[in-house]
């Protein structure tokens, strides 16, 4: 059985026992988190939501919060002596999907 959930402006296809990385959630590590915005549930009886599936929940265990690898943003204008270097690290939350209920 799988589900499609919406979090952080993105959609994820998740299975029970899967580890996923999502945008940072404001919850403590080692706690459980429930996703209420379930767009679809697949398996033997597939269900599509309009826009969400009623009474469907995906439960996940919060493993840790971390930051991604640094990326460099470099702006440059030729012949104008303009250079701007900036770094960015995106925060994320690592989750373990424990249960999908319809």
From Swiss-Prot:
The keyword rRNA-binding applies. The keyword Ribonucleoprotein applies. PROSITE patterns: RIBOSOMAL_L21 (PS01169). GO terms for biological process: translation. One of its GO terms (molecular function) is rRNA binding. Signal peptide: none annotated. It holds the Pfam family Ribosomal_L21p. Keywords: Ribonucleoprotein, Ribosomal protein, RNA-binding, rRNA-binding. Belongs to the bacterial ribosomal protein bL21 family. This protein binds to 23S rRNA in the presence of protein L20. HAMAP family: Ribosomal_bL21 (MF_01363). Part of the 50S ribosomal subunit. Contacts protein L20. This is Large ribosomal subunit protein bL21. It comes from Onion yellows phytoplasma (strain OY-M).
């Amino acid at each position: 059985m799988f589900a499609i959930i919406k979090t952080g402006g993105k959609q994820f296809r998740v299975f029970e026992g899967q580890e996923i990385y999502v945008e940072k959630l404001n919850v403590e590590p080692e706690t459980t988190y429930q996703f209420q915005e379930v767009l679809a549930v697949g398996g033997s009886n597939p269900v599509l939501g309009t826009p969400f599936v009623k009474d469907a929940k995906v439960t996940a265990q919060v493993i840790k919060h971390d930051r991604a690898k640094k990326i460099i943003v470099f702006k440059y204008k030729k012949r104008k002596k303009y250079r701007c270097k900036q770094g960015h690290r995106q925060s994320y939350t690592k989750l373990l999907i424990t249960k999908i209920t319809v």
